Structure formats: structure tokens, C-alpha cells
Curated annotation (Swiss-Prot):
Residues annotated with N-acetylmethionine modification: 1
Protein name from the UniProt record: Probable enoyl-CoA hydratase 1, peroxisomal
Family affiliation: Belongs to the enoyl-CoA hydratase/isomerase family.
Keywords: Acetylation, Fatty acid metabolism, Lipid metabolism, Lyase, Peroxisome
Pfam families cross-referenced by the UniProt entry: ECH_1
Site (Important for catalytic activity): 135
A GO-annotated cellular component: peroxisome
UniProt catalytic activity: a (3S)-3-hydroxyacyl-CoA = a (2E)-enoyl-CoA + H2O; a 4-saturated-(3S)-3-hydroxyacyl-CoA = a (3E)-enoyl-CoA + H2O
NCBIfam families in UniProt: PRK06190.1
Organism: Arabidopsis thaliana (Mouse-ear cress)
Subcellular location, record wording: Peroxisome
Lineage summary: Eukaryota, Viridiplantae, Streptophyta, Embryophyta, Tracheophyta
Record function comment: Straight-chain enoyl-CoA thioesters from C4 up to at least C16 are processed, although with decreasing catalytic rate.
Amino acid sequence: MDQTVSENLIQVKKESGGIAVITINRPKSLNSLTRAMMVDLAKAFKDMDSDESVQVVIFTGSGRSFCSGVDLTAAESVFKGDVKDPETDPVVQMERLRKPIIGAINGFAITAGFELALACDILVASRGAKFMDTHARFGIFPSWGLSQKLSRIIGANKAREVSLTSMPLTADVAGKLGFVNHVVEEGEALKKAREIAEAIIKNEQGMVLRIKSVINDGLKLDLGHALTLEKERAHAYYSGMTKEQFRKMQEFIAGRGSKKPSSKL
């Protein structure tokens, strides 16, 4: 049975089947973030990590925007004080979450919203979605990773253009650049995100967590060290398995092999 919890303007809905949906719910302000919302968002992602009923998290925004950035009417409270605390930093908590995060992006993902999208593992965007970096326009120094992550995904030259001009990156262009996984028609982003989540949930969940971890950790290294990391973790994994675990793995593989392949993503 679906369960919905509302933490101020951050909604957490746990659905049957292992999917949780986190929604920024401030549509009249295009889901701009206050300091309190950031704290609640960080807590929501942190809670998902320890919740054994949740296997995949879908992250979205209500109304016609994913997130239009920080509420600049309360800029000082956002950028000063305990903003550096990792426990209340939503991007830090997203990066710490071991489970896959699928972003379902509708409308605007501006500056902080862009950075929240970058913290997702997989992105689905409606055709009208726009990603925009306005740090340079408003004199705000990036601190949630946009200046470093975007160039590693779409290339340095394109990232410089996006950040220095503050011009929007459309969903179609983002898809061609490999930043967005799937571009769908308006109103279809959540549906597609659920399809991807269901495909992930069909797999062996312990290995899903390990593969996400080794991919993300490997991205921080050069290729040679990343390949070494993979071998080390594979060796540790197989060396630590008991005969009973190997038997269960073989049973799982045999059971999966008897099923028809899933439809193409």
C-alpha cells in the first residue's frame, strides 16, 4: 500500500514494489528551495538509504518545474551558516545514497535544480525541460558540483558555454550529449522513470548497489586506477562468498534464465 509522508514542502511517497518518490512540492514558486526545504530534502534522501523497503528512488518536482534553484529572497540563510554541514546538504546525501536515483525532470532545472539533476544516477526529461546554469548571471559561486560534474559528462567546451552564457540546455540537446538518458513527451517522465525503476528492481539488489558504487567511485579516478578498483572489489566479493551463497547465486541465475527478456528500455 502506498504511504505518503510530507516534510514541509518535500514529499516522500513509498510505493509498493520497492519504489519511493521524492517530490519538491512548491509549485507556485517553481519549486525554488528555502533553507528549510534543503534540510528536509537531505533528510529524505538519508532516510531512503536505511529504509529496507526502498530499492530505487525517483526524484521529481510538482507542477511545471523540477526546481528553479534557490529562493534568492532568503539567500543569506542559504549560503551562510550551516550550509556546509554534510548532514543537511541534499547533494551530499544524494551522493551517499547507495540506491539508484532516477530523476524525472519536468520544466525548469535551474542552477541548484541543475545540480540536483546532476546528482541523479539516471535522468528522464520531458521534451520541454530546460537545464540552465545562472551562477554567473547572479554572482553565485557553484558549490553543489556543477562546475566539475557537467564538463565530465558533456565535455569541457560545451560545459563552459552552458555556464558562462547562462543559456538553457534543452532536453533534446541534453539527450544527444548523453546527459539525459531518455527524452519523453510532456507528462510521461514519471511513467518512464517507473519503468526503469522496475527493470532495476528485477535484478539482484546487492549487486545493483555494488555496481552503482564501483561506477561512481571509479569516475573519480583515472582509468588505470579505476580498473584496479574494480578487480579489487570483485576479488573481495568472490573471496568472501560461502558455498551457500554460490548455490543461491546459481539458483537466481537459473531462475532468471527461464524468463523472457524484458522489453527494451
